[in-house]
Swiss-Prot record:
HAMAP family: TrmD. InterPro entries: Alpha/beta_knot_MTases, tRNA_m1G_MeTrfase_C_sf, tRNA_m1G_MeTrfase_TrmD, tRNA_m1G_MTases_N, tRNA_MeTrfase_TRMD/TRM10. The lineage of its organism: Bacteria, Pseudomonadati, Pseudomonadota, Gammaproteobacteria, Pasteurellales. It is found in: Cytoplasm. This is tRNA (guanine-N(1)-)-methyltransferase.
């Protein structure tokens, strides 16, 4: 997968390219990341990248010309190798909220260009003419789009073939099935007087599967019950959920 990044602070993306699972994916050429800094497309000695908004008000906007030129350079680079164009994403609090289904959808693209805003944002006309989709990571405001872009990259990279040691790691994550993940345990068997659940020590794979499913359902019902509203539960899941609700009603 190829990802182009438009950012005034490309150095921040070393957190993605140099460390962990994504860093290994970059080294193995499973994930290719290139950055374009709008400052490199300025013509004045101060490398100005901000401008005043029409109508006044606090703050500045990203200057149109350097940002647009950086976007065009990234688009050309994306298309140069095989003619495939990249989908252009603007990270914005006004965008569609990123969830696991959205991550899967974005991961189906061969190429993405991520625009990281700064200041008070970018000219609306650039969004209309250069951007395909706007995405948000939540209902809050950050100082820039770099951290949302890194969040998106990290989430999307997990669905690139070969990035994870086992694809099941992605398939069994929280939200992968629409449910929260079940609890997990490792050694020691006893920690501060709390044992590992016996079923996980039994070696009985079917019982372990059912226990994990029940735990996932219980956690989802207790912590994020709204997630269940959009799920088409299986017969097994409905029976387990009824059991869970009955147990909590009794207790």
């Amino acid at each position: 997968m190829w990802i182009g990044i438009i950012s005034l602070f490309p150095e921040m993306f070393k957190a993605i390219t140099d460390f962990g699972v994504t860093g290994r994916a970059v080294k193995q050429d499973l994930l290719q990341i290139q950055c374009w800094n709008p400052r490199d497309f300025t013509f004045d000695k101060h490398k100005t990248v901000d401008d005043r908004p029409y109508g006044g008000g606090p703050g500045m906007l990203m200057m149109v010309q350097p940002l647009r030129d950086a976007i065009h350079a990234a688009k050309q680079a994306a298309k140069a190798e095989d003619g495939v164009e990249a989908k252009v994403i603007y990270l914005s609090p006004q965008g569609r909220k990123l969830d696991q289904q959205g991550v899967k959808t974005l991961a189906s693209n061969q190429k993405l260009i991520l625009i990281c805003g700064r200041y008070e944002g970018v000219d609306e006309r650039l969004i209309q003419t250069e951007v395909d989709e706007e995405w948000s990571i939540g209902d809050y405001v950050l100082t820039g789009g770099e951290l949302p872009a890194m969040t998106l990259i990290d989430a999307v990279a997990r669905f690139v073939p070969g990035v994870l040691g086992k694809q099941a790691s992605a398939d069994e994550d929280s939200f992968a099935t629409g449910l929260l993940d079940c609890p997990h345990y490792t050694r020691p068997e006893m920690l501060d007087g709390i044992p590992v659940p016996e079923v996980l020590m039994s070696g009985h794979h079917e019982n372990i599967r059912k226990w994990r499913l029940e735990q996932s359902l219980e956690r989802t019902w207790l912590r994020r019950p709204e997630l269940l509203d959009s799920l088409a539960l299986t017969d097994e899941q409905r029976v387990l959920l009824a059991k869970i609700k009955k147990q909590h009603k009794i207790s």
